[in-house]
Amino acid sequence: MNPLTRVALAVAAFAALVLALSACGPAHVAGHVPKRRDYAVPDAAGQEAQAASAGSTWREGRAASMLYTDARALRVNDLVVVRIEEIADAKRSADTDLTRRSELNASIEAFLTSLDAPYALKGGATTGFKGLGSTARTERLTATVPAVVRKVLPNGNLFIEGHRVVLVNAEEQHFYISGVVRPIDIDQENGVKSSMVADAEIEFTGRGVLSDNQRQGWLSRLLGWFWPF
C-alpha cells in the first residue's frame, strides 16, 4: 500500500468517526426535557361517563352533529393540529393633579406692645403634584403546533398537549400548547383554533446565541440592583 493510499484511508476513517459521533450527539442547543402537564379535571362531579344502551352504538349526551361528520380525533394518542393565533392589545393611562395650599397669620402685638405691626408673623405654604402616565402593549403570536390527545375526560372533551422544536442557525425555538377542546370544535382536517382551547397554556421560548444576547449581563444586573436612581 503506497503512502498516498494510506493517508486517504486515514482521512476517510477520521471523517466517518466524526460523522458517527455527531450523529450520536444531542440535536438541542442545550439539554432539554419536554414539558408534560399533569392536567386534572377541576370538578369531576356530574361529569360521569354515560354508558351506551344495550345494543346501541349511540351514547346519550353526545353531540348529534358528530354522528354525521368525518373521522376526527376522539381517542388517546390521536393527533390534533392547533392553529395558534393570539393577539393581545392593552392600553392604560392615568392623570393625577393635586394642589394643596395653607396659610398662617399670627400677630404678637398683644404680647409685645412696643413692636410695630410689620413685626406680625405670617406664613404660607403651597404644595402641588401632577402626574401623567400611559402605557400601551401589543403582542401577536401565530404558529401551527401538532398536539396529541393525552386524556379523554368523562364528559367527552379532550385534553391535548403539543410541543414543537425548530432549530435554525444554532437558534432553538420551542412552541408548547396544552388545554381542553371539544370534539365538535375540531374541523374535518383535525385542526382547531387556539381560541377554542379551554384552560390553555401557550408558551413560546427560544434558546441560542440570539436569545443569550437579549439578556442583560450579570454585572449589569448587579449594578442595576445597587443603583438607586
UniProtKB/Swiss-Prot annotation:
Primary location: membrane
Record's keyword annotation contains Membrane: yes
Signal sequence, renumbered to the chain: 1-23
One Pfam short name: FlgH
GO cellular component: bacterial-type flagellum basal body, distal rod, L ring; cell outer membrane
Keywords: Bacterial flagellum, Cell outer membrane, Lipoprotein, Membrane, Palmitate, Signal
Membrane topology listed for this record: Lipid-anchor
GO BP term, example: bacterial-type flagellum-dependent cell motility
PROSITE patterns with a match to the protein in the record: PROKAR_LIPOPROTEIN
Transmembrane segments: none
Subunit structure: The basal body constitutes a major portion of the flagellar organelle and consists of four rings (L,P,S, and M) mounted on a central rod.
Name of protein: Flagellar L-ring protein
